[in-house]
């Protein structure tokens, strides 16, 4: 069976946050989401779901994209017609290139941001635990990690790199100006919250409150930044005391509702509040922006803020893409050998079988020959086999640089290779 590498996904360029949150595949969602790797017909897979993208990397036959899209829509209880217009599909070399760009943060909203590599490593860990990442994806993901490291080492793409959290705090400064007279709350205690806390403290925020479902994690983060840890169940109570709220949880649904905010406005005497929701799915009810003196921004609203960052890093991105092309060639050479080897072995075996049969038939006709003559005949036959198989093998190696197995199928049919008894056959996957 022919196998190919596919990457099917959506990101901040192809889908708005309204769409991305509908199709997010987070750990907090139904376990069925993570059953996608185990669907019949897909040999290997990995799911990467972040605030800006959902991507499924897979090894399978030509039906793989359709299988994945159908399963994806099904686990999110949506129609495939709602999903497909916002997705992209890459195959073979294009899929590998896209993955390497993602790992190196060349495809991120914030060019050069460091979070995506950690998120990809987490996704790989989940795939290995599920038994979904095997020979090809194991090699491909480790190559992606080394590519990202090389890009960061050999270019300045990550120098003074900003993050989504940085952009969120920059937006707060743009709206409020001097920060030293305001109080802030962070909802979530992960890496994005930690970065936001750091930038808020650097901006001079007067007071910082940390809320998280796991209270001990809120305490740990609060201790790093002289903040106050708040139990999750008291979130709404303490909202009235802060001016800026940055939320970045992995919750599967809204945690701050319209009425929550409406009810605290009178306590604040309608003093303005800024909410920055960088979670996908969103943590804060989008309708909150309808309330007077409430300013709500989501992750898509941060695009303008990071445009300067993209312009400043374009030259380094060009250098990074050259590195990526080199590494694609390296991986494809390994993949080519993995996929081609069984066919090359079978081709030589087929010619050797024919040659041995003809040699024995000829020797029976001419009668016994001495050892020296037999060795000479065998040497001649070996040389003839090498010459006869040289051009077909060279063609296969040259054609396979596109990571397309159609020519392998043709060669196997042409030389009737699938009827050769197989022993210890190498993995034939793309």
Swiss-Prot record:
Q: Which GO terms describe its molecular function?
A: glutamyl-tRNA reductase activity; NADP binding
**Domain remark from Swiss-Prot or TrEMBL:** Possesses an unusual extended V-shaped dimeric structure with each monomer consisting of three distinct domains arranged along a curved 'spinal' alpha-helix. The N-terminal catalytic domain specifically recognizes the glutamate moiety of the substrate. The second domain is the NADPH-binding domain, and the third C-terminal domain is responsible for dimerization.
Where does this protein hold NADP(+)? 188-193
Single GO BP term: protoporphyrinogen IX biosynthetic process from glutamate
Q: Where is the active site?
A: 51
The entry's family comment says: Belongs to the glutamyl-tRNA reductase family.
Q: Please state what the protein is called.
A: Glutamyl-tRNA reductase
Q: Which domain of life is it from?
A: Bacteria
Signal found in the keyword field: no
State the remark under miscellaneous.
During catalysis, the active site Cys acts as a nucleophile attacking the alpha-carbonyl group of tRNA-bound glutamate with the formation of a thioester intermediate between enzyme and glutamate, and the concomitant release of tRNA(Glu). The thioester intermediate is finally reduced by direct hydride transfer from NADPH, to form the product GSA.
Residues bound to substrate: 50-53, 108, 113-115, 119
Query: Does the entry feature the keyword Transmembrane, yes or no?
Result: no
Gene name of the encoded protein: hemA
Keywords attached to this Swiss-Prot or TrEMBL record, sorted alphabetically, are: NADP, Oxidoreductase, Porphyrin biosynthesis
């Amino acid at each position: 069976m022919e196998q190919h590498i596919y990457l099917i996904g959506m990101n901040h360029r192809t889908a708005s946050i309204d769409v991305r949150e509908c199709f997010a595949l987070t750990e907090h969602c139904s376990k069925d989401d993570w059953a996608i790797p185990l669907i019949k017909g897909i040999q290997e897979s990995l799911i990467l779901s972040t605030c800006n993208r959902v991507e499924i990397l897979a090894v399978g036959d030509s039906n793989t994209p359709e299988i994945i899209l159908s399963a994806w829509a099904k686990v999110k209880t949506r129609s495939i017609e709602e999903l497909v217009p916002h997705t992209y599909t890459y195959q073979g070399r294009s899929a590998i290139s896209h993955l390497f760009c993602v790992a190196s943060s060349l495809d991120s909203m914030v060019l050069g941001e460091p979070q995506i590599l950690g998120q990809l490593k987490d996704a790989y860990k989940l795939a290995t635990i599920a038994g979904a990442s095997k020979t090809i994806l194991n090699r491909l993901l480790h190559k992606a990690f080394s590519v990202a490291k090389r890009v960061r080492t050999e270019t300045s793409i990550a120098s003074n790199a900003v993050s989504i959290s940085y952009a969120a705090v920059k937006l707060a400064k743009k709206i409020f100006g001097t920060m030293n007279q305001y109080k802030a709350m962070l909802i979530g205690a992960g890496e994005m919250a930690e970065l936001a806390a750091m930038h808020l403290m650097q901006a001079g925020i007067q007071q910082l409150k940390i809320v998280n479902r796991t209270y001990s994690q809120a305490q740990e983060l609060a201790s790093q930044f002289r903040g106050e840890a708040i139990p999750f169940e008291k979130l709404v109570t303490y909202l009235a005391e802060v001016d800026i709220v940055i939320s970045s949880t992995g919750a599967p649904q809204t945690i701050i509702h319209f009425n929550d905010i409406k009810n605290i406005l009178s306590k604040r005497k309608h003093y303005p509040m800024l909410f920055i929701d960088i979670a996908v799915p969103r943590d804060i009810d989008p309708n909150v922006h309808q309330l007077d003196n409430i300013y709500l921004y989501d992750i898509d609203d941060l695009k303008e803020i990071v445009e300067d960052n993209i312009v400043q890093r374009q030259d380094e991105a060009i250098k990074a893409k050259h590195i990526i092309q080199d590494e694609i060639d390296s991986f494809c050479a390994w993949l080519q050998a993995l996929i081609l080897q069984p066919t090359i072995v079978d081709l030589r075996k087929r010619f050797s079988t024919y040659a041995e049969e003809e040699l024995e038939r000829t020797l029976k006709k001419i009668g016994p020959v001495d050892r020296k003559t037999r060795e000479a005949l065998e040497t001649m036959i070996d040389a003839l086999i090498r010459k006869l198989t040289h051009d077909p093998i060279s063609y296969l190696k040259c054609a396979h640089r596109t990571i397309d197995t159609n020519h392998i199928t043709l060669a196997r049919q042409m030389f009737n290779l699938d009827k050769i008894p197989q022993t210890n056959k190498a993995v034939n996957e793309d």
